[in-house]
């Protein structure tokens, strides 16, 4: 288990996110939720101004910026580190101008025209792999070993980013989960069990985002609001496997579970 594990607390400023759409669309509600997640153990707040679920309507960058602007200002005043979850360069550029600590792109930063601006910034970049371009979709995983597919994606994307002057030590790898890997839950389970291969191959930190994902709902038969136990089990598996970052809707149970894992490890060490 990684002792320096960083927890991203998710705040969806959306009307149609699969698990909490509309709850935090108002700025005051989003700010209050961010502060709550920090009090419950999050290290960073990950603001998502558009849903990535397969049935979500597209959101313009202007709308994304309008949603995040007052929340960013309030969290910055609080000294809270912020990650922006958006794949739109205009939204990313605005967030960089407001001093976000991370950009989290579900498309993995494909727009080479934006690389010079990324290179001038200091934010860390969460580069996510997906079997499709953009929001999640209900499609099958590619043929062959999924880890080979993911590794090939990162080989190409890391080369493109670093070739444009973006320092390698700013990159964080996210293999994707749920519909981002395909409709079958077995694909996500395979990646969850083997993501350490990415850490070994690329010598870069890895972020896992399994919270309330479709593969957990498929495995348990539960709805989005009733997979807390399944989420925690998957997150603790990620932590035990050496994840550097975990992105979650619920930091408190994760922190509690991590404390138990750490205590068990220490007990085993001194026996």
UniProtKB/Swiss-Prot annotation:
Residue sites binding 7,8-dihydropteroate per the record: 52, 85, 104, 174, 179, 213-214
Result, substituting residue 179 to G: Reduces ability to complement folP deletion mutation in E.coli strain BW25113
Pathway the protein acts in: Cofactor biosynthesis; tetrahydrofolate biosynthesis; 7,8-dihydrofolate from 2-amino-4-hydroxy-6-hydroxymethyl-7,8-dihydropteridine diphosphate and 4-aminobenzoate: step 1/2
EC number(s) from the headed UniProt entry: 2.5.1.15
Repressor is among the record's keywords: no
PROSITE patterns: DHPS_1, DHPS_2, PTERIN_BINDING
Record-linked Pfam families: Pterin_bind
GO biological process, one term: response to antibiotic
Ligand binding (Mg(2+)): 12
Keywords: Antibiotic resistance, Folate biosynthesis, Magnesium, Metal-binding, Plasmid, Transferase
Top-level taxon of the source organism: Bacteria
Binding site for 6-hydroxymethyl-7,8-dihydropterin: 104, 174, 213
All copies of domain Pterin-binding, residue ranges: 1-259
EC category name: transferase
Keyword flag Metal-binding: yes
Gene3D superfamilies: Dihydropteroate synthase-like
Required cofactor(s): Mg(2+)
Catalytic activity: (7,8-dihydropterin-6-yl)methyl diphosphate + 4-aminobenzoate = 7,8-dihydropteroate + diphosphate
Any one Gene Ontology molecular-function term assigned to this protein's record: metal ion binding
Binding residues for diphosphate: 12, 18, 51-52, 247, 249
Assembly: Homodimer.
Miscellaneous notes: The sulII gene is located on various IncQ (Broad-host-range) plasmids and other small non-conjugative resistance plasmids.
Role summary: Catalyzes the condensation of para-aminobenzoate (pABA) with 6-hydroxymethyl-7,8-dihydropterin diphosphate (DHPt-PP) to form 7,8-dihydropteroate (H2Pte), the immediate precursor of folate derivatives. Confers resistance to sulfonamide antibiotics, including sulfamethoxazole (SMX), sulfadiazine and sulfisoxazole. The type II enzyme is stable whereas type I DHPS loses its activity rapidly.
NCBIfam families, per the entry: DHPS, Sul2
Family to which this protein belongs: Belongs to the DHPS family.
Protein name: Dihydropteroate synthase type-2
